[in-house]
Amino acid sequence: MLAKPLTAIWTLFLLISTAQAQFQFFEQMFGGGGSHQGHQQEQEASSDSSWYQQTWEGTHCTKYLCPDTLACVHFPHHCPCPHPSVEEKVELGEGSAVCVSRGGWTAGEAARKIELARKGVL
């Protein structure tokens, strides 16, 4: 007679502990707002340009401040590419340059394709 209530209590305990474990799993998986000891959550980048504006305004440069990298250079076409490991800088002449994806081409291939496109051949 005592076995039935004890079994019911034990079953209820197992269901509650399983549900709690599932909620903890989903909370951790989806970055729930609970405080976790030992884990620092990185702050998400803002969707507005306030950080960029503050950094731009706080940067000291007496020459030209590159808008993409905030590098201080003598001329705009001297600006480095933001991602040099995957981009190639192509000078267009007239003091301007663009950064293009390397895309697996051989060295100088991007510049050649841009020049052909400028001539209307490509």
Curated annotation (Swiss-Prot):
InterPro entries: LCL2 (IPR034543). GO terms for biological process: ERAD pathway. Keywords: Signal. Residues 1-21 form the signal peptide. Belongs to the LCL2 family. Probable component of the endoplasmic reticulum-associated degradation (ERAD) pathway. This is Long chronological lifespan protein 2. It comes from Talaromyces marneffei (strain ATCC 18224 / CBS 334.59 / QM 7333).
